[in-house]
Amino acid sequence: MSLDIDQIALHQLIKRDEQTLDVVLRDSLLPTNAVVEEMMAELHRVYSAKSKAYGLFNEQSELADALKRSRKGDEDFLSFSRAATGRLRDELAKYPFAEGGVVLFCQYRYLAVEYLLISVLSSCHSMRVNEQLDLSTTHYLDINRADIVARIDLTEWETNPESTRYLTFLKGRVGRKVSDFFMDFLSAAEGLDTKAQNRGLLQAVDDYCADAELGKNERQAYRQQVYSYCNEQLQAGEEIALQALAQELPKLGEKNFQQFSAEQGYALEESFPADRGTLRQLTKFAGSGGGLSINFDALLLDERIFWDAATDTLTIKGTPPNLRDQLQRRAGSK
């Protein structure tokens, strides 16, 4: 992995009691060695694999102003990280779920892009066996389950300040979002809505097929082609590019897919991240609620599965063998 660490700082937040959250600040940057490089490579890998939301700094963001000063050399990186940790402590202390953790600031470069990653990492306790087969306690950073993480694409931020996607962060847990306090700390707002972009793509595909008056099987084959391209991009960690997608798809009528979507005003970006759950709707129908969960291939609609809109009734002809076996056993036990 071609990841080059420029500067990295660690500090700590310690929860003393329900009302007190203390901060412990390092007096120096963390030396870059093999252990640090391995940790950052793992954190980068874990973060890159997770679904993220996009954002941008508010005009009055203190963190953005401090980061600009640091980038210009008016303030060193350690001072920037120490002051930011203090602001994070003040923000986090407002929330009832406040917990301590190791606060990490790392400026690094990956594939010619410069990033600043900020995270609060939890420590977990475990057991270890030494060479003498004695048992002792140990603790480690729980990187795989890190959920308080934000990353700023410094290259994008500085070259394209009008962008709505140079800041990414992880969505929080169910209920009051853990990400709320982190967004307040960053003084940032949500930017590019990836789900909306993917929904817009699906609508554009359906309208394009309808405009070309494709039959049912032709429409589904076209959706499958769109899904195949998008899924390949998703698996490769790449974005959906409308121009590349249009080149993959057969042209319907006088306009290709990109020209059609631009003229119809779907407000799609030239490229945007793929959303797995939304894209699945190209090839499947799925839903759950009221103790019922249904998932089936789109090709089965009006073939083996029929929906009566007037009565909101779904009729299934031919059940899966394992389901049929369960139903037969239950019927036989009555």
From Swiss-Prot:
It is found in: Cytoplasm, Nucleoid. It comes from Yersinia pseudotuberculosis serotype O:3 (strain YPIII). GO terms for cellular component: bacterial nucleoid; cytoplasm. InterPro entries: Nucleoid_associated_NdpA. The keyword Cytoplasm applies. One of its GO terms (molecular function) is single-stranded RNA binding. NCBIfam families: PRK00378.1 (NF001557). It comes from the Bacteria. Belongs to the YejK family. Keywords: Cytoplasm. This is Nucleoid-associated protein YPK_2796.
